[in-house]
């Protein structure tokens, strides 16, 4: 098979070199329209690129039909002569975030076990637009809006998302045009999930009343922000050694004042990420920025973990809470207490 989407993906891969000639590639295959579309495209392009392709299916065990879904994927892979691994979750993931984290752990471990250099997922332009909106509505930084990068590292493996140039409507049309079987996941229509409500209600509303090409517009915004993020990350990596002190942890507030506001915030964020496991937000970053111009001895309110930041000369130092005193050691029952001293 060869059509317009084959040609576009072939051209994109030649330009970007995301999946080099002869790569061994692990395909995340859920059985839905997006992953079936991606798998068929890669199989059709395989003779041109000499890839070695294998698939993995993650069974979260959330749904009563999850075993039937896994069997469907295995049968489809067998029909297409595609080796396929099915991995079932040992425990039911409690949240969507936990499920996502488990999936990516599976992708990395299976890729390593099968000597794959790349993992591909079937995220589309529609997914990228939805992710940007979700992050925006929740509240995030510009970096948080630069969502679903086309390529990033997954440990020693490279994760690639080749379908970010296609919408979900286009993957559906592709599957229909080529008569490809797809698994219908009923949970995709459950409005208890925020992403489903956004996909089924908000995006169509925006398309009807504001911009029929809103998915493309939002995805382009994410792409622009991604290039900005790459630039700022490189700048922060270059400048951090001139601003951050490791022992004891501190920020050089005089040096920090020399930089534009965008770099100040990112350098502070870089510092705090090294020392805070949670609770990093806009309010905390602005509280640290306020210490750039306050008097000696000024300090922030308590941060997560009981830590706080305090001005000491030119430095904004991280102050950790004092460890509790060690518990007294009980006397050995076998030992006798010394006799009391005589009173004189």
From Swiss-Prot:
SUPFAM superfamilies registered for this protein in UniProt: Adenine nucleotide alpha hydrolases-like, MesJ substrate recognition domain-like
Cellular component, GO annotation: cytoplasm
Record field: catalytic activity: cytidine(34) in tRNA(Ile2) + L-lysine + ATP = lysidine(34) in tRNA(Ile2) + AMP + diphosphate + H(+)
Alphabetized InterPro entries for the sequence: Rossmann-like_a/b/a_fold, TilS/TtcA_N, tRNA_Ile_lys_synt, tRNA_Ile_lys_synt_N, tRNA_Ile_lys_synt_subst-bd
EC number(s) stated in the UniProt entry for this protein: 6.3.4.19
Enzyme type, top EC level: ligase
One family name in Pfam for this protein: TilS
Subcellular location: Cytoplasm
Main location (coarse class): cytoplasm
Annotated residues for binding of ATP: 30-35
Domain of life: Bacteria
A GO biological process held by the record: tRNA modification
Region (Disordered): 323-344
Keywords attached to this entry: ATP-binding, Cytoplasm, Ligase, Nucleotide-binding, tRNA processing
GO MF terms, alphabetically ordered: ATP binding; tRNA(Ile)-lysidine synthase activity
Job of this protein: Ligates lysine onto the cytidine present at position 34 of the AUA codon-specific tRNA(Ile) that contains the anticodon CAU, in an ATP-dependent manner. Cytidine is converted to lysidine, thus changing the amino acid specificity of the tRNA from methionine to isoleucine.
Family under the similarity heading: Belongs to the tRNA(Ile)-lysidine synthase family.
Record note on domains: The N-terminal region contains the highly conserved SGGXDS motif, predicted to be a P-loop motif involved in ATP binding.
Protein name: tRNA(Ile)-lysidine synthase
Organism annotation: Thermosynechococcus vestitus (strain NIES-2133 / IAM M-273 / BP-1)
UniProt gene name: tilS
């Amino acid at each position: 098979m060869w059509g317009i989407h084959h040609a576009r993906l072939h051209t994109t891969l030649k330009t970007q070199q995301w999946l080099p000639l002869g790569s061994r590639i692990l395909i995340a295959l859920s059985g839905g329209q997006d992953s079936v579309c991606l798998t068929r495209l890669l199989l059709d392009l395989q003779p041109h690129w000499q890839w070695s392709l294998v698939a993995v299916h993650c069974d979260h065990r959330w749904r009563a039909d999850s075993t039937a879904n896994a069997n469907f994927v295995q049968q489809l892979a067998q029909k297409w002569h595609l080796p396929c691994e099915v991995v079932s979750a040992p425990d039911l993931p409690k949240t969507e975030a936990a499920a996502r984290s488990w999936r990516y752990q599976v992708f990395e471990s299976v890729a390593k076990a099968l000597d794959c250099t790349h993992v591909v997922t079937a995220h589309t332009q529609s997914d990228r637009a939805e992710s940007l909106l979700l992050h925006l509505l929740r509240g995030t930084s510009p970096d948080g809006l630069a969502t679903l990068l086309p390529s990033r590292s997954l440990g020693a493996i490279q994760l690639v998302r080749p379908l970010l140039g296609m919408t979900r409507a286009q993957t559906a049309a592709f599957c229909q045009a080529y008569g490809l079987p797809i698994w219908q996941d009923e949970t995709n229509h459950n409005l208890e999930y925020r992403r489903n409500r956004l996909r089924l209600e908000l995006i169509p509303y925006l398309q009807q009343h504001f911009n029929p090409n809103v998915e493309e517009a939002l995805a382009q915004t994410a792409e622009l922000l991604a290039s900005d993020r790459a630039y700022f990350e490189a700048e922060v990596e270059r400048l951090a050694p001139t601003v951050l002190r490791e022992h004891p942890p501190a920020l050089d507030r005089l040096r920090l004042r020399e930089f534009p506001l965008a770099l100040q915030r990112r350098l502070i964020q870089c510092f705090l990420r090294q020392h805070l496991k949670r609770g990093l937000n806009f309010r905390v970053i602005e509280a640290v920025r306020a210490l750039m111009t306050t008097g000696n001895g000024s300090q922030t309110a308590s941060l997560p973990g009981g830590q706080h930041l305090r001005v000491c000369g030119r430095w904004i130092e991280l102050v950790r809470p004092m460890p509790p005193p060690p518990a007294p050691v009980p006397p050995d029952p076998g030992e006798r207490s010394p006799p009391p001293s005589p009173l004189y």
